[in-house]
A protein has these predicted regions:
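Receiver (REC) domain switch/output surface
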Residues: 106, 115-130
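Receiver (REC) domain switch/active-site region of two-component response regulators
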Residues: 112
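Alpha4 helix (beta4-alpha4-beta5 surface) of REC/receiver domains from two-component response regulators
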Residues: 90-105
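A Lys-centered signature of the CheY-like receiver
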Residues: 109
């Protein structure tokens, strides 16, 4: 059966170090729970899949080594805004802080193959039994004709137009950056400014507040954004 015809319980595998994740995916292939390929952290293609999935998306975030543990809770918090997240961690990693950050489950990545597959499949079943969607898609549908042509801008647009809760600029910088470093605040400001310029001729703008060195994005709004309305 062709790879694209297979439906997996997991929507996307995100890796903080793809070459270390590849052996895990090969080992798990016979269990039919994980896609055959992973995406790097910050992949616009991966986020696009998550943002357009009809049911609640499920992401496996693979953390191949202890060098990635510092600040991992911030990554989980940001990613959990667009997907349910199962985190595969090195042995002896404390799960409590990751669960508090929004992880649906935290599993040692050296868990026996069948047990790991069962726990991931159980997470998918639990998501499917939930009655309420994780995030509303009404705004994304309403503003679909306004989506930019550039793919990276499309992802930012989709994130903000389908937001079910406010986005802190620090979370966006982390989500849109690489495994090694987040996107700079200046780069995010430039990207959101370009998006705003595209939306304004249609009477739409980003809804946001800026205070104490932190910008919080709420979504899209008809008319000027919060900062401009307050001037």
């Amino acid at each position: 059966m062709a790879e694209e015809e297979v439906t997996y319980p997991v929507s996307i595998v995100l890796s903080l170090q793809r070459e270390e994740t590849a052996p895990l995916l090969r080992t798990m292939r016979s269990q039919h729970v994980l896609p055959a390929l992973s995406h790097t952290w910050g992949s616009a293609q991966a986020y696009g899949v998550l943002l357009h999935q009809a049911d609640t998306p499920l992401t496996v975030l693979d953390v191949p080594g202890p060098q990635w543990i510092e600040g991992l809770e911030q990554r989980v918090h940001a990613l959990s805004n667009i997907s349910s997240v199962v985190v595969l961690v090195p042995d002896h990693t404390e799960p409590a802080v990751l669960l508090s950050a929004g992880a649906a489950n935290v599993i040692p990545r050296d868990t026996p193959v069948r047990e790991l597959a069962s726990r991931i499949a159980a997470e998918r079943r639990w998501l499917d039994m939930r009655h309420s969607p994780q995030r509303p898609a009404a705004d994304a549908q309403q503003y679909r004709s306004l989506r930019p042509r550039q793919y990276s801008q499309q992802v930012l647009f989709d994130i903000l137009s389908s937001a079910s809760r406010p986005w802190c600029c620090h979370d966006l910088c982390l989500l849109l950056g690489t495994a090694r470093e987040p996107m700079s605040r200046r780069a995010l400001q430039a990207r959101t400014a370009r998006l705003n310029e595209r939306l304004m001729p249609y009477g739409i703008s980003l809804d946001y507040t800026a205070q104490w060195g932190r910008t919080t994005f709420v979504g899209l709004v008809e008319g000027p954004g919060m900062d401009e309305r307050r001037r």
